[in-house]
């Protein structure tokens, strides 16, 4: 068996075209969806991520504002900027790029973002809405993973899904979204004694721990759908995921590549959340 790849780049292009069309409709009502991105410090990776987000907004017809501050910015100053953006009617989504400098409490900053502008889906109000199945912003990476399943016509209902990782950003919300889709969900993590025992029974495996080759071919049920959220570097400095792609692709039914899988979907779902925030203004 040779797995079929779920092309995140192609799906992302399709969804961004939809975002652009819906944004054009909003502009006819005098509303341009607006995203504010705040970057504090000079983290090189964060600078790349932020540039990609701003470019994606521009390419899809969304308004974006990038506010880049020095690492010496105080927490009080950052909170004041977030509060000002909360009150700005031209801004429908606010994203504070993580990580923040160590003297700034990231949790406090995120909780200061107005829930109706929390397009990253990290606010406790968003997490609570997800938990109880109420409308709210879904964290972008898990949201993108669900869109990938949808794109191949895969219904998680009645399937056994294993999520490897329990972060607030990916693992936990991923498990909740799969539960909402009526999958039976197992969450595995660093204290799980026999990971393979669980993954071999899974129809869907989502790997999201940031560790190379955490999932190998002998750990995968034939025909399973494998979603690789990991972003790592191999011994040659080449981008790779959490999954041993070459081996697992011989066993799985579907698999997401790295790069070109989940990565582009994360930014696309950020655009989608920002668009949906603006659409709420026109009903």
UniProtKB/Swiss-Prot annotation:
InterPro entries hit by this protein: Aminoacid_DH-like_N_sf, NAD(P)-bd_dom_sf, THF_DH/CycHdrlase, THF_DH/CycHdrlase_cat_dom, THF_DH/CycHdrlase_CS, THF_DH/CycHdrlase_NAD-bd_dom
Keywords: Amino-acid biosynthesis, Histidine biosynthesis, Hydrolase, Methionine biosynthesis, Multifunctional enzyme, NADP, One-carbon metabolism, Oxidoreductase, Purine biosynthesis
PROSITE patterns hit by this protein: THF_DHG_CYH_1, THF_DHG_CYH_2
Biological process per Gene Ontology, one example term: methionine biosynthetic process
Transport found in the keyword field: no
NCBIfam families: PRK10792.1 (NF008058), PRK14186.1 (NF010783), PRK14189.1 (NF010786)
Protein name: Bifunctional protein FolD
Source organism of the structure: Methylibium petroleiphilum (strain ATCC BAA-1232 / LMG 22953 / PM1)
Species classification: Bacteria, Pseudomonadati, Pseudomonadota, Betaproteobacteria, Burkholderiales
